[in-house]
């Protein structure tokens, strides 16, 4: 099956499309005066130049005898006037924006810049063909096997990983497959994922990318991949057998293998900027084809207007850019089999001008109207660096968003730097204060505590400050707002007490994340103590700083077991994957009679439901999240970040008749193993997450009978909280009242 264009465009597909007797080529270049197709050898020398025909701004050529594997590029002739945003320079061989495979490598010592070293206004006339990546003609092949059933996001546990870093050190993967698409598809790797329980992987960028010259000048390379060159081409360096188009089939094989295991594939995509950097950067593709069309420019048209921090910003106000992004996304769904996308710096894609943001932008309208994207996961990183760039909570139905407020608060909570538990209630209930608008469900929030950008979980509990010296910028790069705590020693230590606490804190963060409403996401290796040695900006470290060390799995087996247990618990019950906000909805029996409990409630640990004094207690560290349905299922999840043990009392009837701990982050022997009754006391150790399965009455008659037998002590409400730690001197000021505030009824309840 060949690519097809959006309904807005008629005619043959863009890019290179093989035919019975050769290949057709098509390039959109509305400002070009002439375009040459260059068929080239592996070394960049020219086999043949073909003048293309202008078809209303789309340049076309049909060439007999071309076969799969042929390398090619374009030379675009036109006006050179940098002051007007016009940068045509036919000396520069350009990558096809629709190329489905691209050769690797850029020679930054070669003539790859469209201007001379002496003057930005003077065109460089040297041929770049032997210094730049080349487009490759690719034969069509069947799409990967579809997954048996795409799950709604609330049923997904998302695992952010890197194709190379995840398997490059895996001892069971054959050496020639490590760090490749085939390595990620290897049985031992998939077995790890399925045993852990994750059912969706989010791959750091796999579109063909190149390293920036300033990184390479330091002897490093772009590891993350947020520097895209070609939006249809899988990154060739991740292929085990070559870059003559083989990467396309190997990627498809990987998707098929993951799908057979019930694992969805989500791509992190970077449509907000390209690898060409600022107006002084290299000319590899878009700049030479139509600089003024692809990029946002300053008002005087002389410079790129950058809202991404990467030198340029794509301009989705132009049809050619929207077409490219739309068709690229369709291709990855229909031909490459992916199940979703995470859009890097997504706000850039919905700017109506350099200074404005439009949540009804044509970009979003196109995806909403295209049936190809029905059931496809669309996840926004809902910010960029421009004016009004922070758009968290504003993307509307059909979109989910990375929730940085969850990340920041939960880091503070687990280091006992949060003020009370009001915000905790909102964050673990799906952040209704942010996302309960436009009829959006809790799955709209992608909850995470760590991601590729910043400290990984182990480093969050091992370092108070960043240690980015290896990046070559004197530790100036990377955020200083880490909200981390080293547990008593900076970096690696032999202190058994510090190490035990670090293990426990990682267990807590993973368990709390998985027990929160919304969609959980964590980083590959968190479950086995992966460390970046304190580097919180390891974008340029293609080495053991980033790679997953599989030999840590035994040492951190407790963390793996805890994550596995909580993931299994979450996936076992619809209650723990709920996708609606339960604003104090009473549970009823089959006859419609109220059972005296609610679908969600908040417990204080001594008398039952949280009261006004509990919500106003800035030193409170304990909160119980109670969820129930109309049948016989309920859970009570205790979150406790205090450092000392606390006596906790289970809630009275009608909340439950029995409480059994089914998962916890505590050490063996710290918690009761037997089932507890209502109003039963037990000791909750410091810094713990505990999940209890609750036995509940299912009829009003049962409630009445049980309440007659098990009556709460009359003075229970006057006893006060069992857990009242002193407010941390460094705790932040009282946050805005969230859905958990007593004055507006603790919600979601």
Give, region by region, the residue ranges found by the protein language model:
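Short, polar loop/linker segments at the starts of domains and inter-domain junctions
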Residues: 48, 170-187, 463-468, 669-680
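Substrate-binding/active-site clefts of carbohydrate-active enzymes
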Residues: 162-338, 345-369, 434
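Conserved, mostly hydrophobic/aromatic
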Residues: 27, 74, 161, 203, ...
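Carbohydrate-interacting/catalytic domains
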Residues: 1-159, 164, 493, 498-503, ...
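Conserved alpha/beta catalytic core and glycan-binding cleft of carbohydrate-active enzymes
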Residues: 350-353, 358-524, 529, 537-541, ...
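Hydrophobic faces of well-ordered beta-strands that scaffold small-molecule active sites
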Residues: 157-159, 201, 265-267, 341, ...
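Short acidic/polar active-site loop segments enriched in Thr and Asp
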Residues: 33, 199-201, 339, 519-520
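Core domains of carbohydrate- and sulfate-ester-processing enzymes
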Residues: 76-143, 212-227, 261, 281-305, ...
């Amino acid at each position: 099956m060949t690519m097809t264009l959006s309904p807005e465009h008629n005619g043959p597909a863009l890019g290179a499309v093989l035919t019975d007797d050769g290949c057709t080529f098509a390039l959109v270049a509305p400002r070009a005066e002439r375009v040459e197709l260059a068929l080239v050898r592996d070394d960049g020398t020219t086999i043949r130049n073909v003048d293309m025909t202008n078809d209303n701004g789309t340049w076309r050529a049909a060439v007999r005898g071309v076969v799969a594997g042929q390398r090619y590029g374009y030379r675009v002739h036109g006006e050179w006037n940098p002051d007007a945003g016009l940068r045509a320079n036919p000396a520069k061989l350009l990558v096809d924006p629709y190329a489905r495979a691209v050769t690797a490598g850029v020679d930054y010592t070669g003539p790859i810049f469209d201007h001379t070293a002496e003057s930005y206004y003077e065109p460089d006339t040297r041929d770049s063909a032997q210094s730049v990546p080349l487009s490759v003609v690719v034969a069509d092949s069947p799409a990967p096997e579809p997954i048996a059933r795409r799950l709604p996001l609330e049923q997904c546990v998302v695992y952010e990983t890197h194709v190379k870093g995840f398997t490059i050190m895996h001892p069971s993967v054959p050496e020639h497959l490590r760090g490749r698409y085939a390595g990620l598809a290897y049985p031992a790797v998939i077995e790890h994922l399925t045993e852990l329980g994750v059912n969706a992987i989010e791959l750091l960028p796999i579109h063909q990318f190149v390293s920036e010259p300033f990184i390479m000048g330091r002897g490093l390379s772009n590891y993350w991949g947020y520097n895209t060159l070609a939006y249809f081409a899988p990154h060739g360096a991740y292929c085990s057998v070559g870059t003559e188009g083989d990467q396309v089939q190997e990627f498809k094989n990987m998707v098929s293998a993951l799908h057979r295991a019930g694992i969805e594939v989500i791509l992190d995509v970077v449509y907000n900027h390209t690898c060409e950097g600022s107006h002084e950067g290299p000319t590899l593709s878009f700049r030479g084809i139509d600089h003024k069309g692809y990029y946002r420019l300053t008002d005087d048209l002389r410079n790129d207007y950058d809202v991404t921090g990467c030198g340029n910003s794509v301009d989705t106000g132009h049809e050619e850019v929207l077409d490219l992004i739309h068709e690229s996304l369709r291709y990855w769904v229909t031909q490459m089999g992916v199940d979703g996308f995470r859009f890097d710096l997504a706000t850039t894609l919905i700017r109506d001008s350099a200074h404005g943001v439009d949540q009804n932008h044509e970009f979003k309208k196109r995806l909403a109207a295209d049936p190809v994207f029905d059931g496809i996961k669309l996840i926004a990183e809902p910010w960029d660096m421009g004016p009004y760039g922070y758009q968290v909570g504003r993307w509307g139905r059909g979109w989910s968003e990375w929730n940085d407020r969850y990340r920041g608060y939960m880091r503070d909570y687990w280091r006992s730097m949060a003020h009370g538990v009001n915000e905790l209630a909102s964050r673990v209930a799906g952040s209704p204060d942010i996302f309960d608008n436009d009829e959006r469900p809790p799955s709209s929030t992608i909850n995470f505590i760590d991601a590729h950008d910043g400290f990984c979980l182990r480093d969050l509990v091992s370092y108070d400050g960043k240690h980015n010296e290896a990046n070559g910028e004197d530790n100036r790069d990377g955020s200083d707002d880490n909200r981390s705590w080293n547990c008593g020693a900076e970096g690696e230590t032999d202190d058994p007490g510090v190490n035990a606490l670090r293990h426990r804190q990682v267990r807590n963060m993973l368990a709390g994340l998985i027990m929160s409403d919304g969609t959980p996401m964590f980083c590959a290796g968190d479950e086995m103590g992966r460390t970046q040695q304190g580097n919180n900006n390891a974008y340029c470290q293609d080495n053991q700083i980033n790679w997953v060390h599989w030999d840590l799995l035994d040492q951190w087996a407790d963390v793996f077991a805890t994550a596995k247990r909580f993931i299994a618990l979450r996936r076992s019950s619809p209650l723990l994957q709920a996708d609606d906000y339960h604003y104090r909805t009473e549970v009823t029996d089959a006859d419609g009679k109220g059972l005296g409990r609610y679908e969600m409630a908040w417990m204080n640990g001594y008398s039952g439901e949280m009261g006004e004094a509990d919500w106003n207690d800035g030193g409170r560290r304990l909160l119980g999240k109670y969820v129930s349905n109309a049948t016989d299922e309920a859970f009570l999840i205790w979150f406790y970040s205090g450092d000392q043990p606390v006596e906790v009392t289970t809630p009275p009837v009608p909340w439950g008749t029995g409480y059994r701990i089914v998962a916890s982050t505590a050490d063996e022997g710290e918690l009761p193993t037997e089932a507890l009754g209502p109003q039963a006391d037990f000791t909750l150790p410091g810094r713990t997450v505990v999940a209890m399965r609750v036995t509940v009455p299912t009829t009003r008659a049962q409630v009445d009978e049980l309440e007659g037998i098990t009556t709460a002590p009359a003075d229970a409400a006057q006893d006060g909280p069992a857990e009242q730690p002193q407010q941390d001197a460094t705790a932040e000021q009282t946050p805005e009242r969230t859905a958990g505030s007593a004055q507006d009824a603790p919600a979601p309840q």
